[in-house]
C-alpha cells in the first residue's frame, strides 16, 4: 500500500505539471525528456503549494485531504480534458528516437547513481542534524496532529533552532510521503534529482552533441558533495533544482520573447524562494541582471517598458512566495516565531568583513576540490579556452546569472547571522553547477566539437 500511495502522489504531481505545460503550449515543441522532467518538478512544487493552501485554510492535513488536494489540482491542470488527453496520447505513444551507444552509456551511469540514491533514501533514516531538528521534526508532528503549526513549537519552546522556520517545501513533501506510509519520507529526493538531470541533459543536448552532453551530465552527477545531497533531507538540492530550471527557462524567454517561458520561469523561481528564505536575494540580483541584459543586447533588444514589466513581474511572483511563508504564515499561524534580530544583521558596509568573506569563499570552496571535485576548475578553464580560441563569452546571460549568485552569497553573509561559509554557502554552491555545465555545452567551442564529432560519425 505504501508503494501504491507514493506512486499515486508522484503520478498526480506529474499530471499537475504536465497540465500546466500543456496550458502554456510548452509540450508541443519540447523534447519528451525535457517535458517529463519539468512536468514532475513543476508538479511537485504546485502539489506542495496546494497542501500549503490547505494549511492556510486550517484544513487538517490527513492522507485523505492531501490526496484530495492533489486530485483536485490534477483536474484543474488537465482541464479542458480533450486537449490535455490528446497531448498525453502524443507524449506516450509517439515513438522515441533510437538510443545511440553514447546515450546508452549515459543512461546506464545515470540509473546506476540514482539507484544508489534511491536505495539509501528508502532504507536510511533522516541523518542530517538540520533536518532532524527542523523540517522532518515539523513533518512528524504534522502527520500526528494534522497541522504544521503543531505542539512542537510549544513543547520545545525556547529550545528550537531556526531550522523549523525556513523549509516549507521539504517539510510539506515529507508530510505527503510520511502520510503515504514511508518510514523516513525522503524517497522523493532522488526522484526529483533524476527529473532535474533529465531537464539538464535535454537542455545541454539541444546545444551540443549527445556525447558531449552525456559526458557533462555524468560529471554533474559525480560532484561528490552534491551527489550526497540526493539522499539527504535538506533544502539545498531542491532549491538548486527550482532555481536552475528557472534560469534555463528564462533564457528561453529572452531568446524567443514568448510569454509562456516567462510564466514558467516565474513560477519556478517562486518555488525556489519558497524552498529557501535567502534565495530572494539571488533571485533579485539575477532578475536585475537579466533585465539589464534584455535592454542592452545587440541583437533584438527588448524595449525598456517590456523588459521592466516582465522582470518586475517575475520578481513579484518570487516575492509573493517568499512573503506567504516567511511573513504571513510565520507571523499569523505559528505560536512561536524567530525575532528579526535572530534573522538579520547587517555587515554589508564593513569592507574588511566583506573582503574576508570573499577570501574565505574562494579559499574554501572555489579553489578547493574536496567538495566539488574538478567542476569549478573545468568551468574556468573552459571559459578561458573558449574566449581565447573563439573570442566569445556567450551565452553571456548565463555568466551574468553565475556572477549574480556569487555576489548574492557575499550579500547573504552580510545579512543573515545563521549563514556560514562551511554550510550555507557551500550548499548554496549547488546552484552553480547546472549553469556551469549548461554554459560549457552552449559555447562556440562545444559547437565546434559537435561539428567535428558529427562529421566523424558520417564517415
Where are these regions (language model features)?
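Membrane-embedded, hydrophobic transmembrane alpha-helices
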Residues: 1-95
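Transmembrane-helix motifs of polytopic, lipid-linked glycan transferases
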Residues: 72-83, 184-208, 245
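Membrane-lumen/periplasm interface segments of specific transmembrane helices
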Residues: 117, 124, 292-296, 304-386, ...
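Hydrophobic, aromatic-rich transmembrane alpha-helices
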Residues: 193-204, 292, 368-400, 439
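Membrane-interface transmembrane helices that cradle and orient dolichyl/undecaprenyl
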Residues: 246-261
Amino acid at each position: 500500500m505504501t508503494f501504491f500511495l507514493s506512486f499515486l502522489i508522484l503520478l498526480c504531481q506529474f499530471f499537475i505539471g504536465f497540465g500546466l505545460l500543456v496550458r502554456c503550449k510548452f509540450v508541443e515543441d519540447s523534447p519528451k525528456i525535457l517535458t517529463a522532467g519539468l512536468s514532475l518538478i513543476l508538479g511537485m512544487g504546485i502539489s506542495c503549494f496546494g497542501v500549503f493552501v490547505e494549511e492556510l485554510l486550517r484544513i487538517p492535513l490527513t492522507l485523505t485531504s492531501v490526496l484530495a488536494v492533489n486530485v483536485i489540482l490534477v483536474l484543474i491542470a488537465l482541464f479542458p480534458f480533450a486537449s490535455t488527453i490528446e497531448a498525453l496520447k502524443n507524449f506516450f505513444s509517439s515513438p522515441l528516437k533510437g538510443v545511440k551507444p553514447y546515450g546508452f552509456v549515459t543512461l546506464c551511469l545515470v540509473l546506476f547513481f540514482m539507484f544508489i540514491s534511491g536505495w539509501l533514501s528508502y532504507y536510511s533514516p533522516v541523518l542530517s542534524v538540520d533536518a532532524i531538528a527542523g523540517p522532518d521534526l515539523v513533518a512528524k508532528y504534522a502527520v500526528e496532529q494534522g497541522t504544521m503549526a503543531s505542539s512542537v513549537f510549544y513543547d520545545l519552546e525556547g529550545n528550537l533552532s531556526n531550522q523549523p522556520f525556513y523549509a516549507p517545501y521539504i517539510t510539506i513533501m515529507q508530510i505527503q510521503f510520511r502520510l503515504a506510509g514511508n518510514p523516513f519520507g525522503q524517497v522523493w529526493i532522488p526522484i526529483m534529482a533524476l527529473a532535474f538531470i533529465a531537464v539538464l541533459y535535454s537542455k545541454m543536448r539541444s546545444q551540443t552533441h549527445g556525447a558531449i552532453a552525456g559526458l557533462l551530465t555524468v560529471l554533474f552527477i559525480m560532484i561528490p558533495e552534491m551527489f550526497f545531497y540526493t539522499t539527504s533531507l535538506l533544502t539545498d538540492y531542491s532549491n538548486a533544482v527550482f532555481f536552475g530550471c528557472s534560469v534555463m527557462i528564462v533564457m528561453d524567454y529572452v531568446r524567443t520573447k514568448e510569454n509562456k517561458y516567462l510564466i514558467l520561469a516565474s513560477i519556478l523561481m517562486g518555488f525556489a524562494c519558497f524552498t529557501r528564505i535567502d534565495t530572494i536575494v539571488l533571485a533579485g540580483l539575477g532578475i536585475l541582471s537579466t533585465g539589464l541584459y534584455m535592454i542592452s543586447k545587440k541583437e533584438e533588444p527588448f524595449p525598456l517598458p517590456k523588459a521592466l514589466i516582465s522582470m518586475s513581474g517575475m520578481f513579484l511572483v518570487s516575492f509573493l512566495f517568499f512573503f506567504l511563508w516567511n511573513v504571513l504564515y510565520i507571523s499569523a499561524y505559528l505560536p512561536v516565531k524567530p525575532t528579526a534580530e535572530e534573522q538579520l544583521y547587517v555587515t554589508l558596509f564593513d569592507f574588511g568583513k566583506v573582503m574576508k568573506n570573499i577570501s574565505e569563499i574562494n579559499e574554501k570552496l572555489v579553489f578547493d576540490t574536496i567538495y566539488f571535485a574538478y567542476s569549478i576548475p573545468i568551468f574556468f578553464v573552459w571559459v578561458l579556452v573558449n574566449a581565447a580560441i573563439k573570442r566569445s563569452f556567450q551565452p553571456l546571460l548565463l555568466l551574468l546569472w553565475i556572477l549574480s549568485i556569487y555576489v548574492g552569497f557575499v550579500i547573504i553573509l552580510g545579512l543573515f547571522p545563521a549563514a556560514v561559509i562551511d554550510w550555507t554557502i557551500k550548499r548554496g554552491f549547488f546552484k552553480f553547477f547546472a549553469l556551469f555545465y549548461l554554459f560549457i555545452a552552449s559555447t562556440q567551442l562545444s559547437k565546434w566539437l559537435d561539428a567535428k564529432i558529427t562529421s566523424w560519425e558520417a564517415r
